[in-house]
Amino acid sequence: MEKKALKEIKCDLVVVGGGPAGMAAAVAAYEEGLRDILILERDDKLGGILRQCIHNGFGLHRFGEELTGPEYAARYEKMVMEYGIPFMTDTMVTGISPERVVTAQNTKEGIFKIKAGAVILAMGCRERPKGALNIAGHRPAGIYTAGTAQKFVNMKGYMPGREVVILGSGDIGLIMARRMTLEGAKVKAVLELMPYSGGLARNIEQCLNDFGIPLMLSHTVVEIHGKDRLEGVTIGKVDANRQPIPETFEYIPCDTLLLSCGLIPENELTKEYIQRSREWADGLHQPFLS
């Protein structure tokens, strides 16, 4: 059977990612006079991670008022709509060539190509999973990244568990400590490998101190217990080389472990196709990674 030619279109600017950064980039380009813009988003709606961030604290610098995550995203989505900037949701970008040919696919169009004058990458990050942390033990149910738990609670209406330990004190971990507490769970501790927290001081105060949740610095999870469902974790203090100190080990019974251990950039598209540079390429609107 003869192969069907891939559909190819042209566009002055393709924005990969329809989260707040992608929408802001598209809006800024439009306000600078560019009109031929296309946003590609793999999720079914624009907004990215902010759709599940129902806490406030967004928008103070950009809009001069305090907004929740969905409200902040909605502001940009409204501008995208008002400006008539086209976007495609449920669309996965699978490649970008050095000639700025973007390959994407969705259920409606199948596989198609876009010859772009310029490409903006706004794919965001993903959370570091348990497999990247080298924690001893089995793989029982009850272990989630903090963002996954946030989506379950805020968007799906599911509670991941009732007795919780959180590893990592980044802002999402601190916010989920408060969120789980408000939903009736008992957060027994937030552990942080470093001797300082990775979160904002206001989040430590509002999410931990206000609820009496202990923050244990220079501590980590050294072993996971349980086979079918998480039964508990062994924690311990770490030395200056971040190695666990055996005489400090302590067992904490819990049915849920949330991981807030950093983010991994969604940069796979850049590795093969895009030249890394700290300069603005050569004035020809070449895609770049700074």
Where are the regions that the model predicts?
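Residues forming the flavin
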Residues: 1-290
